[in-house]
Design a protein with these regions (language model features):
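Accessory RNA-recognition modules of RNA-modification enzymes
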Residues: 1-171, 176-184
Length: 184
């Protein structure tokens, strides 16, 4: 698993500051990125080369997730692993279920559920994250995943996936959104 730090700075860093960040990165093995302005200004400081994708693994499911430093992920690996294990235990998937994962993000629960069900459809507002779900599905050789871009704070009534019969529903929303979608 890769650890990365994004250093948000509003003023130009001095050569000494940059050297300290590089020293920290080398001594810890972290990837260090600088962000002088908005999210589109994030650039890697160290290591100077290598893959741009970061990874985390959930060995219990045989999964490796690839993500960009600016993607949202669960930051506490131990809590994330425990949360996924508990969710899959509660879902008790037997391999024949159709699962709908709302607010799927990069596919944290989507991929885990796909290892234990017939089909999973993830729904997420961010096109980047939908792309990441599909990318991670291919990376992990999972062919039973679909992902849809949709803003779940809007009415789902006209969406074809909302009219289908689902055996299991996963809802892992951001701070807002669950109330609206579950009321429908």
């Amino acid at each position: 698993d890769t650890v990365a730090a994004v250093v948000r700075h509003l003023e130009q860093l001095s050569a000494a500051d940059l050297e300290q960040w590089i020293h920290l990165a080398k001594s810890t093995g972290w990837h260090v990125y600088l962000q002088p302005k908005g999210p589109d200004t994030v650039a890697r400081l160290w290591p100077a080369d290598g893959p741009e994708r970061l990874t985390y693994r959930i060995g219990e499911f045989g999964l490796e997730y690839q993500f960009a430093v600016t993607d949202f992920t669960q930051i506490n690996a131990a809590i994330n692993r425990a949360m996924m294990m508990q969710a899959m235990k509660l879902l008790d998937l037997q391999g024949s279920e159709r699962v709908l994962d709302l607010f799927c993000g990069l596919g944290n629960f989507t991929l885990a559920a796909a290892t234990r069900s017939r089909e999973v459809v993830g729904v997420e507002v961010s096109e980047t994250m939908v792309h990441r779900v599909l990318q991670n599905a291919r990376h992990n050789s999972l062919d039973n995943i679909q992902a849809v871009t949709f803003d779940l704070t809007k009415s789902i009534a006209g969406q074809s996936w909302a009219k289908e019969p689902w055996d299991t529903l996963i809802v892992d929303p951001p701070r807002s959104g669950a109330k609206e979608v579950l009321e429908e």
